[in-house]
């Protein structure tokens, strides 16, 4: 299961590691999109809006958990790179202790706050009840969602990106089947979507734990589960900035959703659908971020920083190539693509406008995501937090607000606001990268 990524062709390692990661993201995004697609076939705009708003809240929570788990991926990868198996086991054990404790706390806190969350999201009145149902069920399933994601992060830190792909495939198939049963046969609406998502992840967790136990894929002693200050500090030092970074990104999306919600039900539904589509189109940038983090960390742990930099270069080039192709294609198929998720023609038109602007973000994000992965691999995840925070505060949110105010007839400028934020992030990343290289050069010469 453990794989050494510090030898051989860097490009080959990037491709071989990122492909299973890409397929994992594809499957995960597929079952996220399935909720919207299936409910759109059986329910009206209000239910579609409820699922889009509820799933956005859950997506925000999930990406923050995954961001926090980056500390585990990098710590395990660095230990694997230097051949320190005991350190890797300690990192795995402390990761389990930290995240399962956190999941229990989140379960109770979020259940208490679910009404306030729906209010803060400026949920249209017609969608309030469905959104509450969706969030209540998903919050109850938080321990499964957490376990589902940390198991994947542990495997990837060990250099294994294939096992998580298999576990996610199980969740995807189960989710789609349950969605049709709960929403199509039983007509449970948004509650059915939440049940399908939560139960499918629970099934995936149970199966993954059974496989791990049967094949003894991970060796963790009881002592490894005891909190160790030095291990916890490293997990949190890397993970917290990434979690905050991802949280701020999602907050900016939530604010944009709130702005769209205040424009009416049509624009609210359009933005919700496009967010799901963008999640699919961001598969390459997202997989490159995680690939650079894992491969870069192993090589840095092995004392081969030049291979980590080469990993960054190849990842950015691959992401840019795919991003350019997506930008070109979407200009011709944006409206029909949105129309697959709704029978409402007005929603399809508005969504097409938003997507044509937003899609530029997939090109720019490919570069800044690769940089973020590199900074995490170096243990400098604070830089990733900084450039995302600045882009949100200075570009994304103000840009979306001004676009909504001065262009009330179209969502195109709002989409461009997000892309502008990523372009700004690239500028900050390039400056930070140059400073890091200069300091490393001086350290070698001095």
Task: Provide a role label for each language-model segment.
Residues 1-18, 76-141, 185-240, 296-361, ...:
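Short alpha-helical transmembrane segments in multi-pass integral membrane proteins
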Residues 12-73, 77, 240-260:
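Signature of the first transmembrane helix
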Residues 16-32, 137, 171, 200-204, ...:
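Transmembrane helical elements of multi-pass membrane transporters/channels
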Residues 19, 23, 54-57, 97-101, ...:
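Hydrophobic residues within alpha-helical transmembrane segments
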Residues 30-49, 118-125, 181-188, 247-280, ...:
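Helix-terminus/linker motif at the lipid-water interface of multi-pass membrane proteins
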Residues 43-56, 135, 194, 265-280, ...:
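Small-residue hotspots at the loop-to-helix junctions and early N-terminal turns
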Residues 48-108, 145-164, 257, 270-328, ...:
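Small-residue-rich hydrophobic transmembrane alpha-helices
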Residues 138-156, 164-172, 193-206, 286-289, ...:
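Short runs within selected transmembrane alpha-helices of multi-pass transporters and secretion channels
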């Amino acid at each position: 299961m453990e794989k050494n990524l510090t030898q051989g062709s860097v490009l080959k390692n990037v491709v071989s590691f990122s492909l299973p990661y890409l397929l994992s993201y594809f499957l995960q995004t597929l079952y996220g999109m399935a909720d919207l697609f299936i409910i759109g076939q059986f329910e009206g705009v209000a239910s579609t809006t409820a699922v889009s708003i509820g799933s956005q809240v859950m997506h925000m929570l999930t990406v923050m958990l995954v961001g926090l788990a980056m500390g585990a991926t990098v710590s395990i990868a660095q230990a694997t790179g230097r051949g320190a198996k005991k350190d890797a086991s300690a990192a795995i054990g402390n990761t389990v202790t930290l995240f399962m404790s956190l999941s229990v706390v989140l379960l109770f806190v979020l259940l208490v706050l679910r009404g306030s969350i729906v209010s803060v999201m400026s949920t249209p009145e017609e969608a309030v009840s469905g959104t509450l149902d969706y969030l209540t069920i998903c919050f109850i399933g938080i321990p499964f969602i957490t376990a589902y994601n940390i198991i994947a992060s542990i495997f990837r830190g060990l250099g294994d990106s294939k096992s998580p792909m298999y576990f996610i495939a199980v969740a995807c198939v189960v989710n789609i089947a349950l969605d049709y049963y709960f929403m199509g046969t039983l007509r449970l609406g948004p509650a059915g979507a939440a049940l399908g998502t939560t139960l499918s992840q629970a099934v995936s967790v149970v199966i993954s734990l059974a496989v791990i136990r049967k094949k003894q894929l991970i060796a963790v002693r009881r002592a490894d589960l005891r909190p160790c200050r030095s291990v916890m500090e490293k997990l949190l030092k890397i993970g917290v900035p990434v979690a905050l970074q991802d949280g701020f990104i999602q907050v900016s999306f939530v604010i944009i959703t709130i702005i769209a919600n205040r424009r009416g039900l049509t624009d609210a539904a359009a933005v919700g659908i496009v967010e799901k589509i963008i999640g699919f189109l961001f598969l390459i940038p997202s997989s490159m971020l995680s690939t650079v983090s894992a491969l870069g960390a192993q090589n840095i742990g092995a004392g081969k920083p030049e291979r980590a930099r080469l990993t960054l270069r190849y990842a950015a080039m691959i992401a840019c190539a795919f991003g350019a192709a997506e930008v070109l294609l979407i200009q011709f198929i944006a409206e029909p693509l949105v129309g697959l998720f709704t029978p409402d023609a007005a929603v399809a038109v508005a969504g097409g406008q938003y997507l044509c602007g937003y899609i530029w973000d997939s090109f720019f994000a490919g570069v800044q995501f690769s940089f973020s992965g590199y900074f995490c691999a170096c243990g400098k995840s604070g830089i990733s937090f900084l450039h995302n925070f600045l882009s949100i505060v200075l570009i994304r949110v103000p840009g979306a607000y001004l676009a909504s105010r001065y262009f009330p007839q179209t969502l195109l400028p709002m989409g461009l606001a997000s892309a502008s934020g990523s372009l700004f992030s690239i500028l900050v990343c390039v400056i930070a990268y140059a400073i890091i290289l200069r300091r490393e050069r001086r350290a070698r010469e001095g």
